[in-house]
């Protein structure tokens, strides 16, 4: 083999290595960019379109009666509450592609219970501290006499929140943008 043959093979080998390294870097950067985009609310309705549009709209709306808008103002994104599990995402993608999804998405597929909401990542307080923080209300919804009520019974993420107290206390003041319990039940049945 002549020197030029060896040198030509070496150049081809280096060129192939450079192309391979560049391809790996481009794929890694594209993957990282996709991962960052995947964590943004805009991803949810850019990919899934119709079933997620209304949820991203409530996130962006600023309507303080919806948890998603309140959380958006605090810098929270969808994946802070909706954990991205691969099996769930594959099932959701399959439902979307096959046009076999519920619209609107079923409301109670996601439970906001005390341990989910009252922790270091979200509302860093105990149940007693929460009860104390709402003690100035005429009907304190967080007192223990009401039993175990999930946070999501009142605080709705993507629809009007519900003043659950009005189920028993019809005279309880309903915050702006919220629904009374009877209005909620009527809307749910229609």
Label each PLM-derived region with a short phrase.
Residues 2-190:
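Short sequence/structural segments immediately N-terminal
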């Amino acid at each position: 083999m002549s020197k030029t043959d060896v040198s030509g093979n070496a150049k081809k080998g280096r060129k192939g290595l450079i192309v391979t390294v560049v391809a790996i870097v481009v794929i890694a950067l594209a993957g990282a960019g996709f991962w960052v985009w995947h964590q943004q609310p805009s991803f949810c309705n850019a990919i899934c379109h119709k079933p997620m549009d209304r949820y991203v709209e409530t996130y962006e709306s600023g309507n303080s009666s919806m948890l998603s808008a309140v959380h958006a103002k605090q810098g929270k994104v969808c994946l802070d509450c909706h954990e991205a599990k691969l099996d769930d995402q594959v099932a959701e993608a399959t439902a979307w592609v096959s046009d076999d999804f519920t619209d609107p998405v079923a409301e109670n597929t996601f439970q906001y219970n005390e341990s989910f909401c009252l922790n270091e990542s979200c509302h860093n307080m105990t149940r007693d501290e929460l009860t104390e923080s709402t003690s100035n209300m005429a009907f304190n919804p967080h007192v223990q006499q009401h039993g175990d009520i999930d946070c999501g019974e009142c605080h709705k993420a993507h629809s009007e929140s519900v003043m659950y107290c009005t189920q028993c206390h019809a005279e309880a003041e309903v915050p702006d943008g919220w629904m009374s319990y009877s209005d909620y039940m009527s809307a749910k049945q229609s």
